[in-house]
Amino acid sequence: MLSDPIADMLTRIRNATRAYKESVDIPASKFKEELAKLLVREGYVAGVERLRPEGQKFDVLRITLKYGQKREQVIKHIERVSRPGRRAYVSAENLPRVQRGLGLAVVSTSKGLLPDREARKQGVGGEVVCILW
């Protein structure tokens, strides 16, 4: 059993990107699906779909990865910030600016998962789930 399924998801994406895979399958949950859809909206992955493979009991998220024109990785760095053993909560004023605004911090707020820019704009803080650039 995994103690941190979000860290597992981010690790699978990181490993698949470094191996130049077309897509990666991840055990599905609502939170993971919301996180994947946010990555699609922000342009870090090409697509996400929820599937139930034949003969399986549980759904799977298939995340289609995205690469540049010369196969350069769109996601150069992805890391978990708030972990089960050390939660990271921040106010709207203290939200991190990743790579001076060129990266993305994903924040779990009372209004759902938001990129750091939107959370700052709406004036809400929350738990910093991960950062990527």
Swiss-Prot record:
Subunit structure, as described in the record: Part of the 30S ribosomal subunit. Contacts proteins S5 and S12.
UniProtKB keywords: Ribonucleoprotein, Ribosomal protein, RNA-binding, rRNA-binding
Annotated family: Belongs to the universal ribosomal protein uS8 family.
Organism listed in the record: Deinococcus geothermalis (strain DSM 11300 / CIP 105573 / AG-3a)
Protein task: One of the primary rRNA binding proteins, it binds directly to 16S rRNA central domain where it helps coordinate assembly of the platform of the 30S subunit.
This protein's record includes keyword Cell membrane: no
Record's GO cellular component terms: ribonucleoprotein complex; ribosome
GO biological process entries: translation
Family matches, as InterPro entries: Ribosomal_uS8, Ribosomal_uS8_CS, Ribosomal_uS8_sf
GO molecular function: rRNA binding; structural constituent of ribosome
UniProt key word rRNA-binding: yes
Pfam family, one: Ribosomal_S8
Name of the protein: Small ribosomal subunit protein uS8
